[in-house]
């Protein structure tokens, strides 16, 4: 992912509608970024805002969270917005924890809910 800043977008199943609405409402700010997203989340974002530059990776449970983690560790992802569903058990919970751990280790900005994402996005430089 050469050139430009990269933002990762992920949403658990129960939060995908929220992520689509977030993308639609913030398309002007998001249009300044290269976006990587897990498969289904990326599809929902593109449906909501087809003009965004979104690269879809694998679905989270099929390795997408790990792909984004790898991009964080190589410095290719500059910020993470991850709408987490804390009320639904996730079979790939260990992948989610590893992803969050990498965002912390590599000290990139990370929002885990809509309220934080709304505050964070305008402060980021694309």
UniProtKB/Swiss-Prot annotation:
Its EC number is 4.2.3.3. GO terms for molecular function: methylglyoxal synthase activity. SUPFAM superfamilies: Methylglyoxal synthase-like (SSF52335). Residues 1-126 form the MGS-like domain. It is an enzyme of class 4 (lyase). It holds the Pfam family MGS. It catalyses: dihydroxyacetone phosphate = methylglyoxal + phosphate. PROSITE patterns: METHYLGLYOXAL_SYNTH, MGS. One of its GO terms (cellular component) is cytosol. Substrate binds at residues 12, 16, 38-41, 59-60, 92. Transmembrane segments: none annotated. The active site is at residue 65. One of its GO terms (biological process) is methylglyoxal biosynthetic process. Keywords: Lyase. InterPro entries: Methylgl_synth, Methylglyoxal_synth_AS, MGS-like_dom, MGS-like_dom_sf. HAMAP family: Methylglyoxal_synth. Catalyzes the formation of methylglyoxal from dihydroxyacetone phosphate. Belongs to the methylglyoxal synthase family. This is Methylglyoxal synthase. It comes from Rhizobium etli (strain CIAT 652). The gene is mgsA.
